[in-house]
Amino acid sequence: MLFRSYLPDSRPTYFEVTNALALKLFQAHNVDYGVIETGIGGRYDSTNTVRRADKLAVITRLGLDHIDILGDTLEEIAWQKAGIIPYDGTVVALKPEQNSVREVIEEIARGRQS
């Protein structure tokens, strides 16, 4: 799923399996709201399979982590992170340090009418 080209085979990762188990437990226990943290990035993350009308996406501070996968600038990383923004939903982004990062997040939010 996420960055499958880095994996030697097509088996799900540990993160993907535990994410699926957590979602199944949420369903089995009729959880009203669950807090789900993305693994790496967000845009192609297995946690991004959750589709709910009341989904709230929260984007916290960005850093230059996983640059070999997400990109080597804060703007590229912001684009990856903003992939969790739901269509017609709600997004909260902690105050980005750079205007260019804020602009990336706002552009994607506008495009998704969030």
Protein language model features and the residues they cover:
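ATP-dependent carboxylate-amine ligase catalytic core
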Residues: 1-51, 68-70
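Acidic, Mg2+-coordinating active-site environments of NTP-dependent enzymes
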Residues: 30-37, 54-114
